[in-house]
Amino acid sequence: MDWEHPENNVYHVTEEFTVSSWDRLRKIRPDVVLFINGIPFAVIECKSPTVDIQQAIEQTVRNQGTDYAPQLFKFAQIVLAVGMNEALYATCGTGKKFWGIWKEQDEAFMQQSLKKYVNGRLDTTQDRAIISLLSKERLLELTQFFIVYDGNIKKICRYQQYFAVKEIIKTINQNDIRCNRQGGVIWHTQGSGKSITMVMLAKFLLMKLAGQPKIVVVTDRKELDKQIAQTFA
């Protein structure tokens, strides 16, 4: 996989990709599967705008079960349920109630992409979600830096976490004439994924910044030390 030069990879998209269960008693046919270099990276279930999008989520969760085709989802990084005016995403193994929406914050990127891919008609929520999550550079970036394991649970970033990390990186890369950097504060509510955001940021810094960056984690309570250590482990 060429992470630095996405254009060097080979991309394929299939419709109704058929996968059999291990006992060949059942077959699944995801509506769309995206392959990169022959590896299934994204699986999409599409529904009519008149059908509850939860059906697409339930179908995708079911298809990952041992009685269906878990082998397809061993490699997939992103799963989507789309229905023209709705779109929800997750990663493999995510429970139904944890699927989320993506709100694109880089409007210049979105408008440029819409002009390129959606020309001559009004764009939809489905269009925006696919562009935000499955554009070549974005999909590889999400896979490399923004999917982590919390224990045995695979997690993908929320859009707030992604754009928070990107803003931090932007600030870190900006120096004044004396080579000083500005600090900053990322505001979080309780339970919004602060620790996971820190892990994603650390991963990005260690893999992308030149030299040997050092990361210092400071907590204000002793009980947080163990929690943070376990999260980073």
Locate each region found by the language model:
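ATP-dependent helicase/translocase motor core
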Residues: 1-214, 219-233
